[in-house]
């Protein structure tokens, strides 16, 4: 009888402890969103590369910890190549400026781009095999690009101007089975750390590990001696010896040493002399192929067949005026990319919104029902107001190009462009089907008598509140005054 009793007691204690830990963890997560003040954030860290610049926001900002995300802004010079990398956190990229090509390596997908045999060259007595690789996609200004968790990708600027992109890493996403620390794994090169704040935390844990008694280190000294050469380089291959890599890839020792990139000082964006030579159809041909693929995807959907990851569309342009979901000729326009328009976002559980406000244009008070949002100013200037559940304005300031503002879930927000120029901004959202509720629409959907008693209004005032003015969320003050 004692053994079953002890087993039951142990199980009860385990469940109780797990519940307490889960409750404590959930409390800590929720406590991070108790924001009495929100700040407009700008990049905190810069990494200069041979052919570009990488800027990151400190992930320890309370606003970013609340949203559970990290952000990177990259500037890639013409002929610049951002080296292959991946992250345990899904990424959503917006192209602010320029154009280029991107390549993803999707597991289990065929290498559908093949070099014709007629183009193969001879080197001495040996024939060079024609190249083949997975599909390469073009992108341009205004594109949203979805990168799934753990999928390696590279980016190349084939344009004449710098390529500027901002990336959101959803570190709190269910796909990330690690902690909320932003991590970027580079397959090649010797890149500088992009989030130095997280490196400091990792170094502290490393020092704690080395402070353990000798008996608990498990042959650590021997491992340190064997991996002395592995201390150079910051790519994932830098952690393996040249000899091991030579055996693994069946290559020469010199090639294996280059794979480790121990003395490469170019960082994560390198210059490609003479331009990148890849197999890629011309722009018009590629557009025709994408239209055909889109048609096939539509037919598969009607037949009840799911898309495979190999055929999923990863980009969509949301900055074109004709793409607008909401439009007011005097106030501005709003375009949305979610899992309904770009199905791959269903796996990332992310979405985006592009807003263009003309001079003095207003995006009326609204809130995100099921998502945190991050507002990044692309161009222009304006004013943003955010109100919390206590009715306090936690943010009421001017915003300018390059600034980031976090809007927590259900906090009411309103934006207005300045008098001198418009306001153009992107909103990342932590839900693939983020829903928005507008205060104005709520009033129109509420019975008049409810509003009269709630606000102490006369019937005429209620009618004016419900029916006058613009019926959409985009408002221009002058047109509103004329309608009244």
Curated annotation (Swiss-Prot):
InterPro entries found in the cross-reference section: 11S_seedstore_CS, 11S_seedstore_pln, Cupin_1, RmlC-like_jellyroll, RmlC_Cupin_sf, Seed_Storage-Functional
Organism field: Vicia faba
Domain of life: Eukaryota
Residue ranges, compositional bias (Acidic residues): 284-293
Example GO molecular function: nutrient reservoir activity
KW Ion transport (keyword) present: no
Compositional bias of kind Low complexity: 117-129
Cleaved signal peptide residues: 1-22
Lineage: Eukaryota, Viridiplantae, Streptophyta, Embryophyta, Tracheophyta
Gene that encodes the chain: LEB4
The entry's keywords: Disulfide bond, Seed storage protein, Signal, Storage protein
Protein name listed in UniProt: Legumin type B
């Amino acid at each position: 009888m004692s053994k079953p009793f002890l087993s039951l007691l142990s199980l009860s204690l385990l469940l109780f402890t797990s519940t307490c830990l889960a409750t404590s963890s959930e409390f800590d997560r929720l406590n991070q969103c108790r924001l009495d003040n929100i700040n407009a954030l700008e990049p905190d860290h810069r990494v200069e590369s041979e052919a570009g610049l990488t800027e990151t926001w400190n992930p320890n900002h309370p606003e970013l910890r609340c949203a559970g995300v990290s952000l990177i802004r990259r500037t890639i010079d013409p002929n610049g190549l951002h080296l292959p990398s991946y992250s345990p956190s899904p990424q959503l990229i917006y192209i602010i400026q320029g154009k280029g090509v991107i390549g993803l390596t999707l597991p289990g997908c065929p290498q559908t781009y093949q070099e014709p045999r007629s183009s193969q060259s001879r080197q001495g007595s040996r024939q060079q095999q024609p190249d083949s690789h997975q599909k390469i996609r073009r992108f341009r200004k205004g594109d949203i690009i979805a990168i799934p968790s753990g999928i390696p990708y590279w980016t190349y600027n084939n344009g004449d101007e710098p390529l500027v992109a901002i990336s959101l890493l959803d570190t709190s996403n269910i796909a990330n089975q690690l902690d909320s620390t932003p991590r970027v794994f580079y397959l090649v090169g010797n890149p500088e750390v992009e989030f130095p704040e997280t490196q400091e935390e990792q170094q502290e844990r490393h020092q704690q590990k080395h402070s353990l008694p000798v008996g608990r280190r498990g042959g650590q000294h021997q491992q340190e001696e064997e991996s002395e050469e592995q201390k150079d380089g910051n790519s994932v291959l830098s952690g393996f010896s040249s000899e091991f890599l030579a055996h693994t890839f069946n290559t020469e020792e010199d090639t294996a040493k280059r794979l480790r990139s121990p003395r490469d000082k170019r960082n994560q964006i390198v210059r490609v002399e003479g331009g990148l030579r890849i197999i890629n159809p011309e722009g018009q041909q590629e557009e025709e192929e994408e239209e055909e693929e889109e048609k096939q995807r539509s037919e598969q959907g009607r037949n009840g067949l799911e898309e495979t990851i190999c055929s999923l569309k990863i980009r969509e342009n949301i900055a074109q005026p004709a793409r607008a979901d909401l439009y007011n000729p005097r106030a501005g326009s709003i375009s949305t990319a979610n899992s309904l328009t770009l199905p791959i976002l269903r796996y990332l559980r992310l979405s985006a919104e592009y807003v263009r406000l003309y001079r003095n244009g207003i995006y009326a008070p609204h809130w995100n029902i099921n998502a945190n949002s991050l507002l990044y100013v692309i161009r222009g200037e304006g004013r943003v107001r955010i109100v919390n559940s206590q009715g306090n304005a936690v943010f009421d300031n001017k915003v300018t190009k390059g600034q980031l503002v976090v809007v927590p879930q259900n906090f009411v927000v309103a934006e207005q462009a300045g008098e001198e120029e418009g306001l153009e901004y992107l909103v990342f959202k932590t839900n693939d089907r983020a829903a928005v509720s507008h205060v104005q629409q709520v009033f129109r959907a509420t019975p008049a008598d409810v509003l009269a008693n709630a606000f102490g209004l006369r019937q005429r005032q209620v009618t004016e509140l419900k029916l006058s003015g613009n019926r959409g969320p985009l408002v221009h003050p002058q047109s509103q005054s004329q309608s009244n």
